[in-house]
Each structure stands twice: as C-alpha cells, then as structure tokens.
C-alpha cells in the first residue's frame, strides 16, 4: 500500500492567477485538496473608517478603488444612498448617462474575467481579443469622464459632465460590433472540447448553498435562482428597459461561464435601448448644495454590480461627513464558499474554480 504525506502549499499572495494580493493556504494529499484556507487583508485600506472624516463628494474616488474593474457601479451606490436620504430627484439625462456608464463598465468587467480566466487555464488568444474590445469601452468611458479605470464620474444628484458631442453615436456603433465579436468568442471557446472538460461538473454547489453563503450575481444565478436587483428591485431607470436575467441549473463553473457571457448580451440590449431613448437635452446634475449634508437618519441601498449585490449603509448625524458608512462588498461574500468548493477537488481545478468565482481583491479587503 502506497502511503502519502499531506503537504501545505501556499498559493499567493504574489501569484498571477489570483489577480491581486490574495493568499490561499491549501493542504494537499497527492493531487487532492483536503483543506483550503483563504488569507485576506493584504489590500485593506480602511475605506469605511476614512470615509467618516470625508465629505460625501470626497468619498466617491475611494469607491473607485474597491472594485476597480467596475468603478462606475461603486460610484453609483454611494451617490444613490445619499440621494435616498436627501430625497433628491435626478435629472432624466443624468440617469441615462449613469446607466450607459454602468452597463458599459459591466461589459468591460466581464471581458476582463473572460480573458484572464481562460488565460489561467491555458487559452492565450481569448485574452488578447477580450482586451481589444475592453480597450474600446475604456476609450468610450475616457471620452465621457477623462479617466480610464478610476472614473470619479458620478455625483450626488447626477453626473459630473455631460456626454461630449458624438459620444452617443459612438456607443451606438459599438453595440453591433460587440455582438459580432461575442459570436466569435463563442465559436472560439464555448464549444471547445478541452475547455468544456475543464469547467463542466467542476466546482458545483446547490441553490441552498448559494443562499446560505449569501452569494449574489452570477455566483447565485448559476444555481437557478432568478434574482437580479435591476429586475427584482429596480433602481435608477432600469424598469424602462426590456432585458432577461440569465440563470443556470447545475451550479458548476460552466454555468457561471454561461451566465456571465449571456449577461454581456443583455447589457448590450440595455445599452442599445438607452441610446434609443436618450433625451436630446436636459440637465445632468440636480440642484444640490456645494457642501452636501445628509439629514439625520439612516439609509441602506443595494444595486447589482458585475460581481453581485453591492450595498451601502449610511448613518448620518446631519453633518457634512457620515457618522458611519458601511459597504456590502459582493466579492467578500462570494469568496466565503471557496473552501467548500475546493475540498476534495484535484489541484488542477483550483484555478478554474477560483476564476469562476470572480473576485476582485480591492473589494474583498475594502
């Protein structure tokens, strides 16, 4: 009888497939993972505590640096929370610009996930195609707000700048181009036998597991739970758009892949409709004081980011800074199921499973 010895192995914190400073301590017996322990906090910056000494507008750039692949949704959630407390009515043109910015950001975020996830499991060319299209989106957002990654675009009451001349037309032209490229992505990857063998039946969890671990986004919907805040608790102007919510059935890495790829298609639908409905004129910022003071009280709002439900709780004592601010960061919750998924798996599936969960370390650590 062959006797094997268990070994502790560190994955990270400097490891290309973790996409950030994330450490995973795994106990392996041969090639089987017996135990996995995530070690987080390497990127903790104390955002919530810092916010207690900042004016509300000053907090917005800090949200850019949480989920830095989807900064627009982070901008929105803090603004939405303050607007809810103040009872502000947002100009219609600003709402459309917000939706366009958030949905373009969602597509760009999923493209990063698609390209890097496939690169990690051995497919090189998809990474190049994904970043080619992402660069086009980044250029569009750069024209809109003057930044490529950390946008600081949204403001309490609307947005900082109106769309430049010709910008809406460029977005309109991008939609059919992206649809064509997406079909090419499926031809290249989605039916590839090697890829299917790497993802089908790997990292399975049930609907009950997803709910008990407070998963959200594609990590929840891959189990068959049809829940998306843009549909189920519409915010902004999402109730004006016709789009579907992709769901899976098995809850494996393949279902998570399919959900995110279909989400790109649905985001393109939203962008297309937003362009068609875009108001020809109007203000982009409500009349708000230069120094914003939220009234005494509390507010909690939540929205759908590319990684799931991001929430913002604010307690105000009537001053220009929040008394307490708390973010519900979806990557932090989604990461909790990783030890359960990895236990008993072959070590070769580790990166497939981690990539399928799609965490961003700036958001995990706060």
UniProtKB/Swiss-Prot annotation:
It is a peripheral membrane protein. One of its GO terms (cellular component) is plasma membrane. Pfam families: Complex1_49kDa. It catalyses: a quinone + NADH + 5 H(+)(in) = a quinol + NAD(+) + 4 H(+)(out). InterPro entries: NADH_Q_OxRdtase_suD, NDH1_su_D/H, NiFe-Hase_large. Transmembrane segments: none annotated. One of its GO terms (molecular function) is NAD binding. Its EC number is 7.1.1.-. Keywords: Cell membrane, Membrane, NAD, Quinone, Translocase, Transport. It is found in: Cell membrane. It comes from the Bacteria. NDH-1 shuttles electrons from NADH, via FMN and iron-sulfur (Fe-S) centers, to quinones in the respiratory chain. The immediate electron acceptor for the enzyme in this species is believed to be a menaquinone. Couples the redox reaction to proton translocation (for every two electrons transferred, four hydrogen ions are translocated across the cytoplasmic membrane), and thus conserves the redox energy in a proton gradient. NDH-1 is composed of 14 different subunits. Subunits NuoB, C, D, E, F, and G constitute the peripheral sector of the complex. PANTHER family: NADH DEHYDROGENASE [UBIQUINONE] IRON-SULFUR PROTEIN 2, MITOCHONDRIAL (PTHR11993:SF10), NADH-UBIQUINONE OXIDOREDUCTASE 49 KDA SUBUNIT (PTHR11993). Belongs to the complex I 49 kDa subunit family. This is NADH-quinone oxidoreductase subunit D. It comes from Bacillus cereus (strain ATCC 10987 / NRS 248). The gene is nuoD.
